[in-house]
Amino acid sequence: MKKKNIYSIRKLGVGIASVTLGTLLISGGVTPAANAAQHDEAQQNAFYQVLNMPNLNADQRNGFIQSLKDDPSQSANVLGEAQKLNDSQAPKADAQQNNFNKDQQSAFYEILNMPNLNEAQRNGFIQSLKDDPSQSTNVLGEAKKLNESQAPKADNNFNKEQQNAFYEILNMPNLNEEQRNGFIQSLKDDPSQSANLLSEAKKLNESQAPKADNKFNKEQQNAFYEILHLPNLNEEQRNGFIQSLKDDPSQSANLLAEAKKLNDAQAPKADNKFNKEQQNAFYEILHLPNLTEEQRNGFIQSLKDDPSVSKEILAEAKKLNDAQAPKEEDNNKPGKEDNNKPGKEDNNKPGKEDNNKPGKEDGNKPGKEDNKKPGKEDGNKPGKEDNKKPGKEDGNKPGKEDGNKPGKEDGNGVHVVKPGDTVNDIAKANGTTADKIAADNKLADKNMIKPGQELVVDKKQPANHADANKAQALPETGEENPFIGTTVFGGLSLALGAALLAGRRREL
């Protein structure tokens, strides 16, 4: 009987121990899971609230968030510390100036930190608080209801990947505000894409990182330099293009093209560049024959630099041109004063004193005393006294007496430019070339001529062509034969001329 009782007590003890152990095992398996869920929820709540505390600076906020990540079990304590610090840093002056009572301030603060309101909703509630502070409690109640109704479901809450992506994107230094906000919004919209969004954000951040070589790549530097030297941009336009280059160096080529287009569009028109006086001076200086290229270029540059002194510059250029003009030996222009007939017997402006009519010395019409042949009063054709060759006084070709303005005495003419004339047309009409006319007249540009301008034109006529024509025009007298002309008609003409001169002297 005693043994049976001992066995029963032992059996009861084993049973109690088994039940106790089972209870402990069951309790130990459930408690950690529940605790983990609670910690996660507390961490998320603390994370949201810390992010939206307006009086924390970036370093403080990042420190609290890092603490939440390191030990989620301390979320409540971390949140408490953050709230204390946030409250202690709240601006006092603003609260006093805005005359917000305690209810209004509390509602204002809570609404600012409601994570599920969008910006329009948040701003609407805040405006209602400002409009009627006495309704602060009611406004706050409505805001809380809306915030809770828009709260993400438990399965859509921010998981660890999303939180990590959110934190990293916030601290990427090369993203601008618009880019950063875009990635954060994408994280909120679809947390399942957190890894992909973080990867994209990192790529963009790296691509926008400043380069080690002065931040500007080659294209950007080139565009920067060219835009600085575009003369027709104003300061505002130039600064705008430069700022755009800094903001996005990848668009350097496009920005430079736009700047060039604008510069060309604003370039002064040709007819506005030079005023009338400047154009006239420019043209005249180009055609001053005695200036060197260096002198001509100097005057033209001065005209460009200051069009307002065009008259003075032109006057100086003319003075220098006149001073450098070649001196004339006989102070006459050959072939002009004698109507292009060289070799008159008086060797000085032949034909001018007697109104260009040969034979005037005896007061009669030319050629009457010598068988109706003009110029017979001296027994020879003009220029015969120097061995029958007109213009031979100096043993040179006709018209060469003073070495100036070639071609005046040898059949060359002066062409006065008419409206519509071109150098090529003048050259064709006179049997010469445009280059020859340009060279004879020292034209800087053979296309730059103006109406009224006189051009020396080489007509390509042999020097003795006129004499040959005259000789052929008198075949019946035999004057084309030098011997007959000298012995017979020459003698008679000399005798008759001498008699007439003697008679005229007696009359005088």
Swiss-Prot record:
Consequence of changing F47A: Complete loss of binding toepithelial cells
Use in biotech settings: Important immunodiagnostic reagent because of its ability to bind the Fab and Fc fragments of a wide range of mammalian immunoglobulins.
Short sequence motif YSIRK-G/S signaling motif: positions: 7-18
UniProt motif LPXTG sorting signal: location: 474-478
Swiss-Prot/TrEMBL Immunoglobulin-binding region A repeat ranges: 154-211
Record SUPFAM superfamilies: Bacterial immunoglobulin/albumin-binding domains, LysM domain
Disordered: region residues: 318-421, 459-479
PROSITE patterns for this protein: GRAM_POS_ANCHORING, LYSM
Immunoglobulin-binding region D-type repeats, residues: 93-153
An example molecular function term from Gene Ontology annotations: immunoglobulin binding
Propeptide feature ranges: 478-508
A Pfam family per the record: B
Biased composition (Basic and acidic residues): 318-412
Gene3D superfamilies assigned to the protein according to its UniProt record, in alphabetical order: Immunoglobulin FC, subunit C (1.20.5.420), LysM domain (3.10.350.10)
Intervals holding Immunoglobulin-binding region C repeats: 270-327
Cell location: Secreted, Cell wall; Secreted
Sequence repeat spans: 333-340, 341-348, 349-356, 357-364, 365-372, 373-380, 381-388, 389-396, 397-404, 405-412
Region feature 10 X 8 AA approximate tandem repeats, mapped onto this chain: 333-412
Purpose of the protein: Plays a role in the inhibition of the host innate and adaptive immune responses. Possesses five immunoglobulin-binding domains that capture both the fragment crystallizable region (Fc region) and the Fab region (part of Ig that identifies antigen) of immunoglobulins. In turn, Staphylococcus aureus is protected from phagocytic killing via inhibition of Ig Fc region. In addition, the host elicited B-cell response is prevented due to a decrease of antibody-secreting cell proliferation that enter the bone marrow, thereby decreasing long-term antibody production.
Swiss-Prot/TrEMBL domain comment: Each of the immunoglobulin-binding region repeats can bind the Fc region of an immunoglobulin.
Name the UniProt record assigns to this protein: Immunoglobulin G-binding protein A
Species of origin: Staphylococcus aureus (strain Newman)
